[in-house]
């Protein structure tokens, strides 16, 4: 995975965007979050995932072990550390260049994979998960521009034994959902999004990827962030899900990420009679 040198990010930015769009499809910021942030986030996720009763995905073939994968949703409502995570300045800089500087937050959730937990089917997140239902998407949809950027923040060691996410380098250049017949090729050719707790692994949501089985003796947890361009509907309803005090203390950036001032959809019958759109 291409590693970003944050001290020279401005000079690297064009290369980073190129790597995400037409290179391997993934980059990493090592040590993006300190040990205290990782510990805070992990404590919340362990507490919130004590029971395996939340919606999960891509586990259709693993019904007997699905209880070993646990999701925690709506993290902005569960601790200030997550407010900080979605506003990491270097991640924001990359995302602004990739999705436009009015991007917003699609989701911030966590995935906890217990020892013995299963992997997922190879899939894409573009802009969500369901492109296997191709008839639900526009004609000639293609990979020429991005509508999703994913960030994985490991809270435990991510390696081959613990089930670090696998991805197929360059697969974002051919926008389609992986077929069952692609799986042997995927597993033979895939690389791993390996990392240490506190890293930020950033990848193009069109890239074929999946969690792998956790064959270690410890949990493998991560915070999962989805960013979207301003015109894509967020996956999670942030404003309905967070307490008012989170909204009240939010920075202008966090307010935008949550959609506090999102103008659409709008009741134009009730809008003030003035010109609001146009260059003049």
Feature map (PLM): residue ranges:
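Active-site rim elements
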Residues: 79-84, 188-191, 210-212
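Catalytic core of non-heme Fe(II) oxygenases with the double-stranded beta-helix
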Residues: 93-94, 118-193, 232-241
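Short Ser/Thr-interspersed hydrophobic loop/turn segments at strand-loop and sheet-helix junctions
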Residues: 158, 206-207
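Residues that flank catalytic or metal-binding motifs in active/ligand-binding sites
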Residues: 78, 106, 147, 161-163, ...
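A structural signal for short, well-ordered beta-strand segments
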Residues: 108-110, 151-153, 223-227
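Non-heme Fe(II)-dependent double-stranded beta-helix
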Residues: 1-135
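Non-heme Fe(II)/2-oxoglutarate
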Residues: 1-9, 200, 207-208, 212-280
């Amino acid at each position: 995975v291409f590693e970003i040198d944050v001290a020279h990010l401005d000079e690297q930015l064009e290369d980073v965007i190129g790597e995400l769009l037409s290179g391997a499809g993934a980059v990493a910021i090592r040590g993006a979050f300190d040990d205290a942030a990782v510990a805070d986030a992990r404590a919340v996720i362990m507490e919130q995932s004590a029971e395996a009763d939340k919606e999960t995905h891509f586990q259709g073939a693993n019904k007997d072990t699905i209880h070993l994968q646990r999701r925690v949703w709506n993290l902005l409502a569960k601790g200030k550390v997550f407010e900080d995570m979605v506003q990491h300045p270097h991640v924001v800089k990359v995302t602004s260049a990739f999705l436009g500087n009015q991007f917003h937050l699609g989701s911030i959730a966590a995935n906890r994979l217990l020892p013995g937990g299963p992997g997922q089917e190879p899939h894409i997140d573009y802009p969500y998960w369901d492109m296997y239902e191709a008839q639900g998407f526009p004609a000639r949809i293609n990979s020429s521009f991005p509508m999703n950027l994913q960030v994985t923040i490991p809270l435990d060691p991510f390696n081959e034994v613990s089930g670090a996410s696998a991805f197929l380098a360059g697969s974002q250049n051919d926008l389609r959902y992986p077929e069952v017949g692609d799986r042997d090729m995927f597993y033979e050719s895939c690389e791993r999004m390996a990392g240490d707790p506190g890293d930020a692994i950033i990848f193009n949501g069109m890239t074929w990827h999946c969690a792998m089985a956790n064959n270690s003796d410890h949990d493998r947890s991560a915070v999962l962030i989805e960013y979207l361009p301003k015109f894509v509907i967020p996956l999670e309803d942030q404003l309905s899900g967070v307490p008012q005090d989170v909204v009240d203390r939010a920075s202008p950036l966090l307010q935008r990420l949550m959609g506090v001032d999102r103008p659409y959809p709008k009741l134009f019958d009730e809008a003030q009679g003035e010109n609001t759109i146009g260059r003049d």
